[in-house]
Amino acid sequence: FCIISIEVQPRFDLWDQDWKVPLQYGFRQVFGENGGPGGLFHALRVTPPIIEICDNINTICPNAFVFNYSNPMQRVCQTVTTKYPKMKFIGLCHEIASMERQLPEIMETPFENIEYRAGGLNHFSILVEARYKDSRKDAYPIIRKKAHNYYKNYINDHEVQSQKPGGERGVFFELFNRYNYIPITTDSHLGEYIQWAYSVADHEAIMDFYNKYKNQCLTFYESKESYCNYFDLKKKPKERVVSIIEGILNDLNYEEAAVNLPNKGYIEHIPNNIVVEIPGIVNKDRVIGVKLENYPLDFSSLLINQASVIRLTTEAILEKSKSKALKALLADPVVDN
């Protein structure tokens, strides 16, 4: 097993450049990490060293399972799986964990009594279905009925410093109101892919999230403590990769909530081989995606807008082509200048 979780340093100085350089030319970004100009610059910076790691994996242990945590997840995974289509390369993201915290409160039942499936692109996914295990009752009507009041008052003290109710829900509510499905993430990520997002995003809450994340990272980087002292290794790990590795070693054939894999008809409206985020079945041989039946065509139209950007970014990196990088930027729906 190989786990990739890297950043090119100095992480936050470079991220500031991803924000400020486009701003000098009049371009405003919602977050600048995974989409738009910042997402492209980030991908061009971090993907080459990940490709180098995968070159070594392909030489030393070509049958290894490779798990990636590095952003921009979508573009990293697309580039690696294009160069190494036979590599067991799986992208993992933490956003799906929001469902484990929120659905039990909305549905008024323990998480163990909930079945759900979500999918789309990384950081651009929706809750597709949810039901109660005991009664098999469809829970989406209840979720839709309660969603506005619940999220309007939801305080995300898990990731932000302030206690502002309903923070980072501007783009979230626009998508829910228009498409009638619950996004599994918030404005900072959703807003990176949609051309009209800047005008409705909660920028104050986004900066609150960014500042807390930055402070946490810098505190850890600057700490002289060892990993063993900084983290409580006696606690049961919450990282989903642990459960996935257990599932592979024990051939459990269980369904994992979210993995990033090349599309093989898992979302029918998305071109094949574009990396999608979908549930996956974990066994000793591989992690295989689960087809999301009846995925809403209207929402997938937003996802399709990213397909050409993703492909051009991949080609730019693998071919080391400045021309392809510029074309990826020009194809991005959020680039309006």
Feature-to-residue mapping (PLM):
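N-terminal Rossmann-like NAD(P) cofactor-binding module of classical short-chain dehydrogenase/reductase
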Residues: F1-I6
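Active-site beta-alpha loop architecture of Rossmann-like, nucleotide-cofactor-dependent enzymes
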Residues: Q9
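Rossmann-fold NAD(P)-binding glycine/threonine-rich loop
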Residues: D13-Y84
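Soluble or luminal CAZymes and related metallo-dependent hydrolases
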Residues: H42-P49, E95, K236, N305
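Flexible, glycine- and charge-enriched loops at secondary-structure boundaries
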Residues: A43, F89, K320
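A broad, structural surface signal
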Residues: P48, E52-D55, T59, Q78, ...
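Rossmann-fold dinucleotide-binding core
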Residues: D55, I60, F65-D134
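Long, compositionally biased stretches enriched for glycine and/or charged residues
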Residues: E108-N337
